[in-house]
Each structure stands twice: as C-alpha cells, then as structure tokens.
Amino acid sequence: MSFRVAVLGGGVGGLSAAQELAERGFDVAVYERRPDFGGKARSIAVPNSAAPGREPLPGEHGFRFFPSFYKHLPDSMKRIPAAGKSVFDNLVFSTRVQIARTGKSTLVEPTRFPQTLDDWTAVFKSLFANLGIPENEVLFFIDRLLVLLTSCEERRFAEYENIAWWDFIAAKSKSVSYQKYLGEGTTRSLVAMKAEVSSTRTVGYIDLQLMLGLMCAPGGFDRVLNGPTNQAWIDPWLAYLTSMGVVLQGNSTARSFQLEGRRIARVMIDQGGVTVPVTADFYVSALPVEIMTGLVTDDIKSAAPSLAHLDKLQTRWMNGIQFYLKNDVPLVRGHSNYLDSPWALTSISQRQFWPEVDFAALGDGAVGGILSVDISDWDTPGIVYGKPATNCTADEIKTEAWAQLKSHLNTGGVEPLSDTNLLSWFLDPDIQFPNPSAVTNAEPLLINPAGSLQYRPEACTEIPNLFLASDYVRTYTDLATMEGANEAARRSVNAILDASGSNAARAQLWPLQEPEIFKPMREYDLVRFKLGLPHG
C-alpha cells in the first residue's frame, strides 16, 4: 500500500512535488484553487479573442525564461514526455540581451570564458561600458563583485544577508548613473526589489549568476520555450502526471489545517462552496506565502514555530502585459531591459522563438507578433500620466507601458514600435480593478529584504507530516523563481522519503555554481572569518 500525499497548490512547486512523488510510487492528489494548473507560469487564453475556427490569443502572467544557472527545473523537464522527446527539448537558447536606455540601446553578446583575474576584470568592465558611469565607480563596483566571489559561505550568511545591496555597493555616495544602472537596474527589473533594502546575499549572488551567464554560458544566456507555455510545457506536464495516477482537482481552495496531537489530521478544502475534508499520510503546502500565512493559526504556530513569522515576509508586484502586433518586431534574439523606464520594464519578442506556432490560426488571424512585457515597479510615477501603475486603470497601464517602450526603442530615426502596428493588448488578470484607485494583485512576488532569511522556514516543518514546496522556503536558489519553487519541492519530497522510510532515490539538489578560480580565495576567507577578521 502506497502512502497518500495531498499537495496544496498547483503551481510549479506543487506540480514539481507531485512529479517527484509519483515517480517514486506515492499516491498523489493536487488541489488548486483555480480551474487551471500551472500557477504564475501558465498560459492564459485571452477572453473573446478567437474568431470562429481559430484559437484564442495566448496571454500570460509574465514571460517565462530559464537562466543558465537553473539546474533543478530543467532536470525535471527532461523527464516530462512531449511528442516523442521531452519538454526540455522545447527550450531554445536566446543569444543576446538588449540593454535599452532612453535614446540609446546596446547589445550584449557572449564572450569567451575568463581565465585569469585580469580577464574577469576586463569582462566585467565590458558589461558596464557605455552606461555613462565614471570609470573609477565601475572599478569600485567590480571590486564589490570580486569581494562576493571570494567570500566564504559562512560570511555570506552571517554578514551579507544582513547588509542592504545599496549599502554594500556604497551607492549613496556614487553618481546618479551608478545608482540607476548598477544599484537599481537588476533589482528592479528582474526581482522587483528595491536596492535600498534588498539582501546583498540574495541580490548580489543572483546578479553574479546572471552575469556569469552573460559572459560564459555555453549556447546562450538563457533559454525560452518554443511556444506558449501551456502548449510547450504545462499541458504535457499535466498529461504526464495523470498518466502516473496523480489526481488533479481544480477549483479547490485550502481553508484550514486541522491538527490532532502533533500531526495534521485533515485539510478542509472548499470545492464550489462546499467544504470537504481531505485526509492523507503527508501534506505538502505549495501555496504562496501570502496564502499560507492566512492558514497558519496559533495552534499551527505552536506545533511548527518555524512558520510563526511568515507574516514578516514581504511581497511586491511583478506582472505582465502582452502587445499583439500586426507585423512582427523581433527587436533582438533575447530579452530587452529598459533601464530608464520608471516602471522597470523588460520584454521579449516571442514569435522568433515559436517557429511551429501558426499565428494565422490565432485570434482573428491578423496578429503577426507578440511583444510580452513585464512591469516590475508599480510604485513609481510614469511618463504619461505621472501616476504609479497601482493608481492607473487598465487602459492607462497599457498606454504608459507602450510609451515607455517607445521612448527607449524609437531612437535615431528608427521606429520599431508604431501605434498603427498595435492591434490589441492583454493585461495579466491577476491585476484586479475594484475601482481605479484600489488596484489589487492576486499573485504578488516574494522579495528578499536584508535580514529576512530568519523568517523563512525549511521544507520540512516541525509538524511530522507537513512539508513546504513554495519559493519562500530556504533553498540554494534563494529567490522567488520557478527554479526556487522546484528546488523547494525536491527538498519537501526528500523529507517525505525520510519520514516514510522509503529507499527510493532522493531528488538531486544543486548548489549555485561559481568559477573554480575563486575557490582558494574563498577557502582563505573562511580562515579569516573563523578568526573574526574581515574579508581581505
């Protein structure tokens, strides 16, 4: 008789846990509050966009990308069959990054792998060229990066976790360009965080992983899917799970955990207005932190003290808007980062990566390209209405985002974006408008302020049959990403394997990889750290 596992939440974390468990013979059911599975990663059929005989236009919460440092999620994808291959084979490389500024843009392309410290300095300098930053400040920033690369793990947790990125790079005393491009650039656009409060341990090392990918990842900076996410990944994933006997129950909202003694006895699930008890041997919560916080009652906190401070974790907004174009505008074979945009925009032009998608069969047949844009700063006033996105209507968000894109791309007599080429648009429906001045977000993003690690639990809680598979769990990845959710799921599965006495192979875990050239320096820094000395 196999053990029964109830997984709460059908996003990447929940589905990853279900996959790892089902592959090891567990009896798994997944409960998701939405009718559709996939969480933030899922595709969204644009309502009322399909003409008779055609498919709806594909929308999304935000574009998916798979940086070169992702290891856990690609490994899972390699085991999901799709058209005789695997969904991993539906990933294709992007090969360039567009660093766009108002009136100017720059392409960053891969370089050879640095072999010496001089090489590393030269490569870092090339990344930050043409940004209008004084050379002495660029060199100071490079020194800060090298400090991170040569610091031991113990110092990272004891010191850098509690230092804001803004302070670590001494941004307050530097030029506006330094503050804007090196201080705020990545934190705003990629992780929706403020440099003034972001943990150096998180932001600094994720910055480094992304930069290492820019410099020397084989094949390209990152991968993207070769079609809409559901078609290329989520639908085959759900088919694979059901083929292994996983039960997928949508429209099922977790309302409460019920304890008996030290164990979870049941979870109460709301299904269409009817509350039903769900019992299992083990429970995996793959719910986002803002939902899980509401389920952690005083008795749960007493039984699992590591969950007592989830309400101190913070979230911000990072949501997408898609622009549907009459004629495709490829821009660059990769992502674009709009450094001067008040709303911290990033984008990808998708058709070039979707060779097998028949665009004539989508919508009314007139769409020739899709520009998918993420908005990561919802609190800064825009350039059209002078209002932050949270105070804008949906139409104003569209107009503002489009204007910010044009201010970066339409330069030097070249006009890749024209109003006449824009057919329609779609804003992530998680952005909800009860009225124009009270916009809410149904799926915010966890952020990592300095010192917040202390509030984040391990995947294995003090309740013997309750485990966590969400991106707020402590992981190597350490960031609210699909990779972090997948890694958390693996950790929860390994804990269940231990608790059940299973002899099945444990799910593999990968620490973030860093260049070997710096290993002796990290070992030397460990000696200094143990002696109570600063990094030297």
Which residue stretches match the model-derived regions?
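N-terminal Rossmann-like FAD-binding beta1-loop-alpha1 element of flavoenzymes
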Residues: 3-30
